[in-house]
């Protein structure tokens, strides 16, 4: 696992996941562009990197191994809660991270009520785990 110090970028989205993706993309490419909603099988959010933040949906259902196998990304970036650091992980590191710090929830009934796996709110334990491996 490696870390990337992120550049500061004025917030354009209320959604933390969209802001995390935009800040990471700006740091890596210098581009400021609209957040996308492309399918995970179509590739990473920025090159071969899938970018996530706290409370992000990891996968629909609970089979994260199958999700990673179908994923178009080769690496996974977790952007911390204050948008200053991205922890860049391999698929194996991401599997371990998401398994430890993920939780199973349901979509709202208005969205079909399907089961999905999400990352938990960023905690001290999560931060310590990331720092110990970076």
Label the predicted regions:
Residues 1-134:
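Nucleic-acid endonuclease domains
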């Amino acid at each position: 696992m490696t870390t990337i110090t992120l550049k500061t970028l004025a917030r354009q989205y209320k959604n933390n996941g969209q802001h995390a993706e935009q800040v990471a993309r700006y740091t890596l490419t210098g581009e400021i562009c609209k957040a996308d909603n492309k399918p995970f099988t179509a590739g990473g959010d920025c090159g071969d990197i899938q970018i996530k933040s706290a409370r992000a949906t990891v996968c629909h259902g609970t089979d994260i191994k199958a999700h990673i196998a179908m994923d178009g990304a080769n690496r996974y970036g977790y952007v911390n809660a204050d948008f200053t650091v991205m922890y860049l992980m391999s698929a194996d590191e991401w599997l371990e991270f998401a398994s430890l710090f993920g939780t199973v929830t349901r979509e709202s009934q208005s969205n079909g009520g399907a089961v999905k796996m999400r990352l938990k709110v960023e905690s001290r334990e999560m931060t310590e785990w990331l720092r110990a491996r970076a």
